[in-house]
Regions:
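Polyanion-binding surfaces on beta-sheet-dominated domains and ring/shell assemblies
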Residues: 1-270
Length: 270
């Protein structure tokens, strides 16, 4: 195949300029005043913006923004499963969790890596307990989560976004799924960690919880690093409390989505 010598091909691997960020990496996680690098307290969550109906072609969609963490989700289905799959009385959830190539410090590949596959499986595990899958025999619901910018806690943001997208799609659910994450540094827990906090060498471990607040059910639990038993139990309880604080925002976003849908139907009818 002839080579176009006039074309300048882009590099396969790129890295942004992070000189200011490198200085922040050398700072301690907690200042003398008891504040984190972004000015939050240990148990303080980042401000959250959540909105549904951002992808017109999808059955349901949502967008979440937690300062510099930005995630979008699109839901398609229920649709008939492939003939190769065995008949099941319950429907099936599938998820593709993907970091956009430009979302992280290092350029991500177009193919799913091991981390993205692990996150995809965890999202399915977290949402299966909330969706009434018995209502959709021999059908599947496809969830596509894309991280547009990753400044930490992208997995929890993806679960929250997917939960709202399922609700907007009209999928019957037992409850909305909220999610929260924290990192542990000795006896100190930092809720909703940023990317810099998550990669700090001072961190002992990380816990991510998916929680159904109304039913009081933990639908997903993911732990990395080394934590003592007492620390792990305390971390899970703290994440559950964080999920409960996020839940009203999730509920209000779904209410606003329903209002917009009803208003649109009334305008079409008139």
């Amino acid at each position: 195949m002839p080579v176009d010598n006039k074309r300048i091909p882009g590099p396969e691997i790129t890295q942004p300029v992070v000189l200011r960020e490198e200085k922040r990496l050398r700072k301690p996680l907690i200042s003398r005043e008891g504040l984190r690098q972004d000015g939050r307290k240990e148990d303080e969550l980042r401000p959250m913006f959540l909105r549904s109906g951002v992808v017109s072609q999808a059955r349901g969609s949502a967008y979440i923004e937690m300062r510099r963490t930005k995630v979008t989700c699109a839901v398609y289905g229920p649709r008939e499963s492939s003939r190769q799959q065995e008949f099941s009385q319950k429907g099936k959830l599938t998820c593709e969790f993907k970091f956009a190539p430009f979302s992280c410090w290092q350029r991500r590949q177009h193919m799913q890596d091991s981390e993205e596959k692990e996150f995809s499986s965890f999202v399915v595990q977290a949402l299966e307990s909330a969706v009434c899958l018995e209502k959709f025999p021999k059908a599947q619901i496809d969830i596509y989560i894309t991280v547009l910018e990753n400044d930490g806690n992208a997995l929890s943001a993806g679960i929250i976004c997917a939960s709202l997208a399922l609700g907007e799609a009209g999928i019957e659910m037992y409850d909305l799924v909220s999610s929260c994450s924290l990192i542990q540094k000795g006896s100190t827990s930092l809720m909703d960690p940023t990317f810099l906090e998550g990669v700090s060498p001072e961190v002992d471990g990380r816990v991510t919880v998916a929680f159904l607040p109304t039913l009081n059910i933990v639908s997903g639990l993911l732990q990395d690093g080394e934590l003592a038993h007492d620390q792990a139990v305390k971390a899970v309880k703290s994440c559950m409390e964080g999920c409960a604080r996020i839940y009203p925002v999730l509920q209000e976003s779904l209410v606003q989505a329903v209002k917009r849908t009803m208003k649109s139907k009334q305008q079409d009818a008139s």
